[in-house]
A protein has these predicted regions:
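Compositionally biased, disordered extreme N-termini, encompassing classical targeting presequences
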Residues: 1-2, 68
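Short, well-ordered alpha-helical segments
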Residues: 2-35
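Broad gene-expression machinery/nucleic-acid interaction feature
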Residues: 4-6, 42, 54-60
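Flexible glycine-/small-residue-rich
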Residues: 11-13, 42, 59, 63-65
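Short, conserved loop-to-beta-strand elements that form functional interface hotspots
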Residues: 38-47
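C-terminal structural segments of small proteins and small subunits
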Residues: 50-68
């Protein structure tokens, strides 16, 4: 039987929502092993004077729980 833990992470990029999601996953991979599924939960923009400054993507990510 397998157990999975779910966390939410947010990535940001000046280029696109896809780059923001990729950045979030790449950063999470540095400290979380065995990532399984990433679901896009929310996307938003940081604006200044009506211009896009930052794309932000919130992800719900699951990974296999190994216990302590």
């Amino acid at each position: 039987m397998s157990v999975y833990k779910v966390i939410e992470i947010i990535g940001s990029s000046s280029q696109s929502w896809e780059d923001a999601a990729t950045e979030a996953i790449e950063t999470a991979r540095q400290t979380v092993r065995d990532l399984r599924v990433a679901e896009v939960v929310e996307q938003d923009l940081d604006l200044a004077d009506g211009n896009t400054i930052t794309f932000r993507t919130k992800l719900r990510v699951s990974f296999k729980y190994e216990g302590e």
